[in-house]
Amino acid sequence: MIKSQKEYLERIEYLNTLSHHYYNLDESIVSDAVYDELYQELKAYEEKNPNDIQANSPTQKVGATTTTPFSKNPHLMRMWSLDDVFNQSELQAWLQRILKVYPNASFVCSPKLDGVSLNLLYHHGKLVSATTRGNGLEGELVTNNAKHIANIPHFIAYDGEIEIRGEVIISKEDFEALNKERLEANEPLFANPRNAASGSLRQLDSEITKKRKLQFIPWGVGKHSLNFLSFKECLDFIVSLGFGAIQYLSLNKNHQEIEESYHTLIKEREGFFALLDGMVIVVNELGIQKELGYTQKSPKFACAYKFPALEKHTKIIGVINQVGRSGAITPVALLEPVEIAGAMVNRATLHNYSEIEKKNIMLNDRVVVIRSGDVIPKIIKPLETYRDGSQHKIERPKVCPICSHELLCEEIFTYCQNLNCPARLKESLIHFASKDALNIQGLGDKVIEQLFEEKLIVNALDLYALKLEDLMRLDKFKIKKAQNLLDAIQKSKNPPLWRLINALGIEHIGKGASKTLARYGLNVLEKSEAEFLEMEGFGVEMAHSLVNFYASNQEFIRSLFDLLNPKNSDMAKEKQKSSSVFNNKTIVLTGTLSKPRQEYAQMLENLGAKISSSVSAKTDFLIVGENPGSKLALAKKHGVSVLNEEELLKRLKELD
């Protein structure tokens, strides 16, 4: 709570410093939740003391002034910031201000993506500039980098001048992969997907941007000459131009419907492909929007209904070391319990000891913890201003916490090299039975631990020798449960080849790489390092890991393959793919089809096609359903082959 004008001025200075770090340096000094709390206190003081309001207050401006090597570029129409609401009562108050004057107003609700706002300017159908939000009036010109974002069309079927606005994001999956690469290269990790997206969009080298797998999700328009009556019509028009559709978009009439949409999003939040921090609510009727107008900073016809925070501050009270299936030691921080988005968090990964030293994290530190989707909670950084002298250095272990074998300490990672370490064996089997490997139902972590304790198994081969009486020795196992597990183990025989390769737990070889390897047949693991390097997406580390793993485990691998007899259906699929007319072709689907577009997209991808959301001169086929819209005209302009649904089905049938 701000009690004086002096505290008010200090708060402005502090919040402006935070904004500068957030917008210009891609660095979050405090969590979003802490910033929101400080901002709301500032706003409350200004509401009580309007004569004290300063022009440089963050409530009076959008974003931050840019201070980067990129040139500044003005927006044709201002990019506004949204006012936040944090609970039902605040939302109700916001709605009442609108509905008491416009009782028939409706509201478009959509996910609030946590990324970087970008303004795309098209003139006569051509992308002429891409500018970040900046201070709302002008931002950074990042056109060359934006052109490397795969789902931003360089041309659209609209001749007028139009600003299309949206969010540049990186998916949670791609964010984790990017940070894994940086970790292995001993580079600083990105704190969160938003920082990764911002840093990637603002690279001086566009080739780096191209590699980062950024995505653009549209959410509105700036200057335009469209004649639509509703905001939803505008969004539908943007999608028809070749931009990706907005997931979980809904049109609502009242508070109850908006709350239902909000809670649906919260429910889907963890499984959503990108990081969300709320729901955007916009008055649908453009005439009402115009009459409502703007405050100095925000539109009165829209707000952001924020989600509960996924970042919190807590204290490290201890550190334990876990041993992975490769022998890598992972330090895990024990935390004072803290609730993050409805889940109680009492531990978080510290990645490795090199990362601990780089971030200068100490025992008894107060730290920022983040939890994103299904990702294990992690510590972003220490809050050094809270240090009181009780902190201690977190020391690297010298022996394995499980088998007491001496550890190998490399520059980044620390390893237990004892191949018979129980932790390594146990973790290998947990992975072997996991969903993306052999997916053995009922064979979870606790069951595997019991099997080890009873000395019933040492490796994966032992699973297939288990008998009913063996399982009956385990805690909480009766005849039916034991028989079900035996049946599930037997059912895991004859798996797809890629699943068995993935189940081996080879370092640097995940699900995607396993599928690539499976294309080369049952003897793929016997290939040389040079042959592995010729495979798409395989680097030196992966090739080296494969060769070393096979050399060390030849007998075990052969025995496992003989016992499980994996199916080599991947080879047949590759043969079908190579003979397909759609192999290596870029395809766009548009209009209403009898099956969901995603179903057709999956069929075509299985035949080697690349699915795109926008038509260009590089498009090979346009698949059209009913009401194809502007994409059909654009396809004819570029000489793209057009197939209707009947023709597509005929060609697919010919390939069976």
Curated annotation (Swiss-Prot):
This is DNA ligase. Belongs to the NAD-dependent DNA ligase family. LigA subfamily. Zn(2+) binds at C400, C403, C416, C421. NAD(+) binds at D32, A33, V34, Y35, D36, S81, L82, R133, E167, K306. SMART domains: BRCT, HhH1, LIGANc. One of its GO terms (biological process) is DNA repair. It catalyses: NAD(+) + (deoxyribonucleotide)n-3'-hydroxyl + 5'-phospho-(deoxyribonucleotide)m = (deoxyribonucleotide)n+m + AMP + beta-nicotinamide D-nucleotide. SUPFAM superfamilies: BRCT domain, DNA ligase/mRNA capping enzyme, catalytic domain, Nucleic acid-binding proteins, RuvA domain 2-like. It comes from Helicobacter pylori (strain P12). It comes from the Bacteria. The keyword Ribonucleoprotein does not apply. Signal peptide: none annotated. The active site is at K112. Residues 577-656 form the BRCT domain. The keyword NAD applies. Keywords: DNA damage, DNA repair, DNA replication, Ligase, Magnesium, Manganese, Metal-binding, NAD, Zinc.
